[in-house]
């Protein structure tokens, strides 16, 4: 059996050496899997994704990529660093982090040109992507003139153009309308069918079953409290309520009090 693309063994990470963000995380991710990371705000989801992308490094425990132990020193090897950046793509929760060039077109082609891809190949890839994402009319615009949905599409294009084997996405559908959400999910599933490993953090439990074949639930102690198949996680009302992923409503019927878990909706807010 091949090595997992990512393997974490008892991984811990703290900010400033005193604010725990990941506690004893164990996880193996195989090539071609669809992984969802769910949990309340502050539970460690984004920190985990940053670690997988080599933006931060474990304080304790073991972290490997395709069988190679990863540390800050690993990226001092230019050949390894370039290979990793070609194979692993990251889409940030805040698209503005990725969009820093004067125009959308320059943002999309920045990554592959930095990695040494030829201009003709880069242009061909860009043309295909902008058609797929329906962002042809945005190419000459400044990113700061775009809506959040447009920015997310451009950020996704700037990652997909590298053609990574592994795609890591932090809340890719947050704040999007249902049509744009559907478009992005369909694109991600097409990428998975084509062989890509997809790792997504999300609060939108209504997309989890479609975008996952394994789900990891993070609790407020910044550790994995449960992992399993999507249906087993999503049907565990107690688990979701205990980890602030569902409301629990109660009402009295005659002499009994009944409690019901209510899953958060990404595009729906209740007034209480």
Label each region the model flagged.
Residues 53:
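Helix-to-loop junction immediately C-terminal to a conserved catalytic motif
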Residues 202-203:
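H-loop/switch region of ABC-family ATPase nucleotide-binding domains
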Residues 142-146:
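Conserved ABC ATPase signature
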Residues 120-138:
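Conserved ABC ATPase "signature" region
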Residues 167-170:
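Catalytic Walker B motif of ABC-type/P-loop ATPase nucleotide-binding domains
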Residues 208-210:
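A short, surface-exposed alpha-helical micro-motif characterized by mixed small hydrophobic
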Residues 222-244:
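Conserved beta-strand-loop-alpha-helix hinge in the C-terminal portion
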């Amino acid at each position: 059996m091949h090595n997992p693309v990512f393997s974490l063994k008892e991984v811990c990470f703290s900010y400033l050496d005193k604010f725990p963000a990941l506690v004893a995380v164990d996880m193996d991710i195989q090539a071609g899997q669809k992984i969802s990371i769910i949990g309340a705000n502050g539970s460690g989801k984004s920190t985990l994704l940053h670690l997988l992308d080599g933006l931060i490094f474990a304080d304790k425990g073991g972290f490997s990529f395709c069988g190679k132990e990863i540390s800050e020193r690993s990226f001092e090897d230019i050949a390894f660093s370039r290979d990793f950046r070609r194979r692993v793509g990251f889409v940030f929760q805040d698209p503005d982090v990725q969009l820093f060039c004067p125009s959308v077109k320059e943002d999309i082609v920045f990554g592959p040109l930095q990695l040494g891809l030829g201009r003709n190949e880069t242009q061909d890839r860009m043309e295909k992507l902008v058609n797929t994402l329906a962002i042809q009319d945005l190419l000459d615009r400044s990113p700061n003139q775009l809506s959040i949905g447009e920015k997310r599409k451009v950020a996704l294009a700037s990652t997909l153009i590298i053609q990574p084997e592994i795609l890591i996405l932090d809340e890719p559908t947050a704040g999007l309308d249902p049509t744009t959400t559907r478009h992005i999910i369909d694109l991600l599933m097409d990428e998975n069918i084509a062989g890509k490993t997809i790792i997504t953090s999300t609060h939108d439990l209504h997309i989890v079953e479609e975008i996952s074949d394994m789900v990891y639930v993070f609790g407020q102690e910044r550790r994995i409290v449960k992992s399993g198949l999507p249906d087993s996680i999503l049907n565990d009302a107690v688990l979701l309520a205990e980890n602030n992923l569902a409301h629990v409503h109660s009402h009295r019927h005659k002499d009994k009090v009944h409690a019901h878990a209510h899953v958060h909706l990404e595009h729906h807010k209740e007034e209480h």
